[in-house]
Amino acid sequence: MSELTTIARPYAKAAFDFAIEQNAVEKWANMLHFSSELIKDETMQTFLKSSLSASKLADTVISICGEQLDQYGQNLIRLMAENKRLEVLPAIYQAFQHYVEEHQKVAEVQVISAQPLNATQEQKIASAMEKRLARKVKLNCSLDSSLIAGVIIRTDDFVIDGSSRGQLSRLANELQL
């Protein structure tokens, strides 16, 4: 687990719990997404490394975000600036999204394939994973031609390696090559 994730998790959990309490999960997701995209900007990264005070940094970020932030979002920005944690906002957004998906009983599943999958193949994988995980799944598909053939399926809890590269690797280990 990265240091940023460790730092981000309590902020994300607090924001998520507050959003649930206020019935404003989508609003908070939008605020965090907008502010995290702003923080990822190269110009903003340089600005954050300047010697400005925390209140000046916070005021600038809040000013740029404008109406995208409500008073609670602004308070979060001020708190993060005071704690010198503004650069953690993208990780907070990711952790927040993870809490949302858990709350909605949605599991994120990464599917890495050697060749592009068609809609039928994606649907079969999604159905099988929904059955196995007992929750809805959100597939994130990507390509890796080094797999030769087949797929690798990853969730937070396990990995299924059905790739030719994985099979060859396991065979080589058994033969001790």
UniProtKB/Swiss-Prot annotation:
Alphabetically ordered keywords of this record: ATP synthesis, Cell inner membrane, Cell membrane, CF(1), Hydrogen ion transport, Ion transport, Membrane, Transport
The molecule here is called ATP synthase subunit delta
Per the entry, what this protein does is:
F(1)F(0) ATP synthase produces ATP from ADP in the presence of a proton or sodium gradient. F-type ATPases consist of two structural domains, F(1) containing the extramembraneous catalytic core and F(0) containing the membrane proton channel, linked together by a central stalk and a peripheral stalk. During catalysis, ATP synthesis in the catalytic domain of F(1) is coupled via a rotary mechanism of the central stalk subunits to proton translocation. This protein is part of the stalk that links CF(0) to CF(1). It either transmits conformational changes from CF(0) to CF(1) or is implicated in proton conduction.
> Membrane topology per the record?
Peripheral membrane protein
Assembly, in brief, is: F-type ATPases have 2 components, F(1) - the catalytic core - and F(0) - the membrane proton channel. F(1) has five subunits: alpha(3), beta(3), gamma(1), delta(1), epsilon(1). F(0) has three main subunits: a(1), b(2) and c(10-14). The alpha and beta chains form an alternating ring which encloses part of the gamma chain. F(1) is attached to F(0) by a central stalk formed by the gamma and epsilon chains, while a peripheral stalk is formed by the delta and b chains.
The keyword Magnesium is assigned to this record: no
The GO terms this record gives for MF are:
proton-transporting ATP synthase activity, rotational mechanism
Location relative to the cell: Cell inner membrane
Keyword Cell wall biogenesis/degradation among record annotations: no
The source's superkingdom equals Bacteria
Q: What is any Pfam family matched here?
A: OSCP
Q: Which residues form a coiled coil?
A: none
Q: Can you tell me which family this protein belongs to?
A: Belongs to the ATPase delta chain family.
In terms of PANTHER family, this protein maps to:
ATP SYNTHASE DELTA CHAIN
| Listed GO CC annotations | plasma membrane; proton-transporting ATP synthase complex
Q: What is its main location?
A: membrane
